[in-house]
A protein has these predicted regions:
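Acidic, surface-exposed loops and disordered segments
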Residues: 1-171
Length: 171
């Protein structure tokens, strides 16, 4: 199987991590992969907040209902919608930042890291709390918090393909 397809199937949500620091080079590669994602009108609305401060990670964990992983690193993917057209602001930043997030998750998997994507936007109380913790400026909206670390659990590669979910030419 082609390596890129294999990597997609190997990417799984990991919620248990080793107590091991992630190398700066791997963090940078993940961010480079994220920023290689396609965007509407090449707008590139993303901002990435890399968090390795244990206090801030703990605050993020306690602010998000499903974010209980004890990871040594969190990357918050945000959309910078300040001063952009309504079309981009209202519609495309979420898609653009989601594409960047998936690239980052795949890169992490290829680097031997585990990740779990915890949604922030559009839950108002999550957006408000994460914005406060990270001191985000007006116009920068947190989309998600990606917990990253060396996996302390193994999950088999899989696809969730269901033929009945595929429709050709019409529903």
């Amino acid at each position: 199987m082609e390596q890129s397809i294999k990597l997609i199937f190997e990417r799984r949500s990991i919620r248990k991590f080793q107590d091991k620091k992630i190398e700066e080079e791997k963090i940078e590669l993940m961010l480079k992969a994220a920023m290689a994602a396609p965007t509407a009108m090449n707008y590139q609305p993303w901002e990435f907040v890399v968090i390795n401060d244990e206090t801030k990670i703990s605050q993020i964990r306690s602010s998000l209902t499903f974010a209980k992983s004890l990871a040594p690193l969190v990357i918050c993917v945000c959309g910078n919608v300040g001063g952009v057209s309504r079309l981009v602001k209202d519609r495309f930043w979420v898609q653009d930042c989601s594409a960047a997030t998936e690239n980052m998750l795949l890169a992490a998997t290829g680097l031997g890291l585990g990740t779990v994507w915890c949604g922030v936007y559009p839950i108002t109380m999550y957006v408000k709390r994460i914005s406060e913790i990270l001191q985000l400026p007006t116009g920068v909206i947190p989309l998600n918090a990606i917990f990253v670390g060396y996996p302390a659990e193994e999950k088999e590669a899989r696809t969730q393909y269901k033929a009945e979910k595929v429709h050709f030419n019409s529903y």
